């Protein structure tokens, strides 16, 4: 549903504006350098599990994905249509998980994961993102976590955990925002729910 709605709003003018806004300045210069530096040697393919799982299909190599996404945006000066962006979004969200293995194989240091993250950013700004990914992005934006846990809910959960733990450990405390603490507890997001 999110892809369909995003595509309806993605006029060629809006697509061009979003791409140009994201790729302006230093970001655009960095992308252009990567595009010109990439030798298209395919060394990155040896590291990509998507490419390795499709050995007879060169379109799954990281360099092919870049050519069909971010490098295409640069070559076309952002002048793409909604259907092209749908294909780009599919590649960005289903053919690369940005594990960064490819970077270690690239002889010239092209940061492929960074480039794919830019593609995802552009898709996100256009609303051409799978619903479950968009929901996670919205949650992070609103609550700084992927489970929609508000700060007051988190504090209530910690108070409750502290009370429960006192049965076994009298006097235990879970201090919040304590400077100079010896330990920091980083919780798994679903835990407070």
Regions found by a protein language model. Name each.
Residues 28-35, 68-193:
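Iron-sulfur-cluster electron-transfer modules
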Residues 1-93:
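Ferredoxin-type iron-sulfur electron-transfer modules and their immediate structural context
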């Amino acid at each position: 549903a999110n892809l369909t709605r995003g595509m309806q709003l993605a006029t060629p003018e809006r697509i061009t504006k979003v791409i140009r806004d994201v790729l302006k300045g230093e970001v655009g210069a960095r992308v252009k350098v990567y595009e010109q530096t990439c030798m298209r040697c395919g060394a990155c393919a040896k590291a990509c599990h998507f490419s390795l799982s499709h050995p007879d299909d060169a379109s799954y190599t990281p360099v092919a994905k870049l050519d069909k996404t971010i490098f295409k945006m640069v070559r076309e000066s952002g002048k793409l249509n909604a259907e092209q962006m749908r294909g780009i979004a599919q590649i960005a969200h289903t053919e690369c998980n940005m594990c960064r293995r490819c970077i270690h194989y690239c002889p010239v240091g092209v940061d492929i994961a960074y480039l794919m993250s830019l593609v995802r950013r552009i898709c996100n700004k256009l609303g051409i993102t799978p619903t479950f990914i968009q929901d996670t992005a919205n949650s992070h934006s609103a609550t700084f976590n992927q489970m929609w846990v508000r700060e007051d809910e988190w504090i209530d959960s910690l108070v409750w955990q502290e009370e429960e733990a006192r049965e076994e450990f009298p006097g235990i405390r879970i201090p919040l925002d304590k400077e100079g603490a010896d330990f920091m507890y980083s919780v798994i997001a679903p835990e407070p729910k």
